[in-house]
Amino acid sequence: MAGRYDRNPFDEDDVNPFAGGSVPPASNSRMPPLPHEPGFYNDRGATVDIPLDSTKDMKKKEKELQAKEAELNKRESELRRREEAASRAGIVIEEKNWPPFFPIIHHDISNEIPIHLQRMQYLAFSSLLGLAACLFWNIIATTAAWIKGAGVMIWLLAIIYFISGVPGAYVLWYRPLYNAMRTESALKFGWFFLFYLIHILFCIWSAVAPPFPFKGKSLAGILPAIDVIGNNAIVGIFYFIGFGLFCLESLLSVVVIQQVYMYFRGSGKAAEMKREAARGAMRSAF
């Protein structure tokens, strides 16, 4: 009986399952190993070489930027100090904004002039531009006369009229009216009336253009136009156009001074100006 159980039933059989040849034997080749990856995180010994020259350049640029920043801060603080000193002294720093393509003056009727006075101010501004147009056309007319043999002197005088007339009108009567509208100053209104009357007289004189005290045909008025149209029709037409422009400027100026004077009287500025003039005379006397 014991002989039947001498063999262990759990022993592995010496049977090769691949001996039949249906399954090919495994190859002895191995898969190639993975390439070695650098230890970005664990390799603490890795170093990065930074050129010393680039480090020096960066430090130099940083110092230059800090110096420029300090200079800008210094200029800003100095500008702020000047603005504060000017505001304490009552000086208003105005930004130049007109004409838009080349700002040379500060001019902002819509934001600085009261609404009920803006129409009068725009009319006065049109009068200033009209004077500039008249004097510019006067240069064109005298240039044509000079080409036709009238002499260079009348052309030079026309240039002088334009160079002195337009800035003079702005300083003497337009800017005082602008400030008077802003501040309601009676004395500035009086300054405007004085020089605007001179402006009106000049426009009327230019429309007539007698030969005295101005030189010959240096103004494109009616008398020179009649004189030159017989010799040269084109020059005569230029002078007649100048006469028409000076007439329109004179009419517009009369309308402007009439409206400003009506407002001046109606708002009580006339009596205020008299009181201010009286106080000024008393201060001068004492």
Curated annotation (Swiss-Prot):
The keyword Coiled coil applies. It is found in: Cell membrane; Cytoplasmic vesicle, Secretory vesicle membrane. One of its GO terms (cellular component) is recycling endosome membrane. Residues 1-10, 54-63 have a biased composition (Basic and acidic residues). It is a multi-pass membrane protein. It comes from the Eukaryota. The keyword Nuclease does not apply. The chain crosses the membrane at residues 127-147, 152-172, 189-209, 237-257. Keywords: Cell membrane, Coiled coil, Cytoplasmic vesicle, Membrane, Transmembrane, Transmembrane helix, Transport. Residues 1-63 are annotated as: Disordered. GO terms for biological process: protein transport. Residues 1-126, 258-286 are cytoplasmic. Probably involved in membrane trafficking. Belongs to the SCAMP family. This is Secretory carrier-associated membrane protein 2. It comes from Oryza sativa subsp. japonica (Rice). The gene is SCAMP2.
